[in-house]
């Protein structure tokens, strides 16, 4: 677990470094002076001011004590600044490029990682994962498994000595591929036949059970399912697969964020409904939200240790997904993030008004408070998952 946490910390640091480097390079290319490039948040651990570097003159490069973050400090960062070399003095389009350069770098990093993985083995985690017919091929590293999670008392399953932990091999001579397929075969047997044939594996031994089942009857089992571990391999189409997979998971991430926000808002509103049924439904929605979100503690303490056990390819795949998540998060219109800063800047431009330093500080402070509150809640939920 410790190794997984260390790997996760390194990956997160590198992804944030890449994001901030995007901002810094874009600033330099658009005539904005970069004063500081830092990994982590203060207090300062080590640092050095370099007279001449690829980010400009007299840039201070720092590593700070608080990890999981980073920043670029530019000259005249407030929109109202107007001296030569100030961020505020740059044109609207120059600021737009600077603000979204970090997002672009995160997407580029994800696409590059996924392209390399498409050559050496890209973990396939969804059935419709992007691939190119005629080139991409799927290899099953570890077959899936459907097993009996529980047996209902006095049910057909119990009467025929089907036990919790039994692995389902075949139902009616058809190979078991998923829990959904088993449910369908059981229903077909109860509707069209008077018996069901089940082949199970118990303690390494295969056993066949033939049980009578009447029309509409249930077998009386709950199933647990472990998905097959599959890898996708491509040759000439690897760059296409890398970009396509990046776009696919970007879309899924946006959809996921929308669903979470929708459930959060409706869940909170429904909590005040007079109907007990609606309030219970609200509790379920909020519980789903709590299970769907993961912060740094969850990523480092749960996800990376599990991914580490599955090898380098899964770690790289997870790094790509986190890079996509960083890009999506920074596009969102939250004032303290890149997308929020751009939205505020755009609103003031459309209104033809100057965004004063005081107004910008107040808006950013509100955004930061919202972010810190969300992070506090997510961190608490992460710790509950570690138990």
Regions inferred by a protein language model and the residue ranges of each:
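Small-residue-rich helix-interface/hinge motifs
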Residues: 3-83, 322-324, 329-351
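PDZ-domain C-terminal substructure recognizer with occasional recognition of PDZ-binding tails
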Residues: 163, 169-170, 181-224
């Amino acid at each position: 677990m410790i190794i997984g946490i260390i790997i996760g910390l390194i990956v997160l640091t590198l992804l944030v470094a890449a994001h901030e480097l995007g901002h810094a390079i874009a600033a330099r290319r658009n005539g904005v002076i970069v004063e500081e490039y830092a990994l982590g948040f203060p207090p300062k651990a080590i640092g050095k001011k370099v007279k001449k570097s690829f980010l400009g003159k007299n840039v201070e490069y720092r590593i700070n004590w608080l990890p999981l973050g980073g920043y670029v400090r530019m000259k005249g960062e407030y929109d109202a600044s107007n001296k030569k070399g100030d961020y505020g003095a740059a044109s609207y389009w120059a600021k737009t490029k600077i603000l979204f350069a970090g997002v672009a770098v995160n997407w580029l990093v994800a696409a590059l990682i996924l392209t390399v993985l498409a050559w050496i083995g890209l973990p396939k985690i969804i059935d419709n994962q992007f691939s190119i017919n005629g080139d991409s091929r799927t290899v099953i590293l570890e077959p899936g498994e459907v097993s009996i999670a529980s047996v209902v008392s006095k049910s057909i399953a119990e009467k025929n000595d089907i036990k919790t932990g039994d692995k389902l091999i075949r139902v009616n001579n058809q190979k078991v591929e998923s829990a959904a397929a088993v449910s369908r075969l059981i229903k077909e047997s109860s509707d069209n036949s008077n018996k069901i044939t089940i082949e199970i594996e118990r303690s390494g031994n295969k056993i066949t059970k033939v049980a009578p089942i009447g029309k509409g009857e249930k077998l009386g089992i709950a199933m647990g399912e472990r998905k097959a571990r599959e890898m996708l391999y491509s040759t000439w189409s690897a760059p296409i697969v890398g970009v396509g997979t990046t776009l696919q998971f970007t879309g899924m991430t946006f959809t996921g964020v929308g669903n979470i926000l929708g459930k959060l808002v409706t869940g909170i509103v429904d909590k005040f409904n007079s109907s007990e049924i609606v309030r219970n439904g609200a509790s379920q929605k909020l519980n789903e939200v709590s299970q769907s979100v993961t912060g740094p503690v969850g990523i480092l303490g749960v996800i990376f240790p599990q991914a580490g056990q599955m090898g380098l390819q899964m770690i790289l795949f997870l790094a790509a997904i986190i890079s996509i998540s960083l890009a999506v998060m920074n596009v969102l219109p939250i004032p303290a993030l890149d997308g929020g800063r751009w939205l505020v800047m755009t609103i003031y431009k459309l209104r033809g008004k100057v965004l004063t330093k005081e107004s910008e500080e107040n808006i950013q402070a509100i955004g930061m408070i919202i972010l810190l509150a969300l992070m506090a809640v997510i961190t608490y939920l992460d710790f509950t998952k570690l138990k």
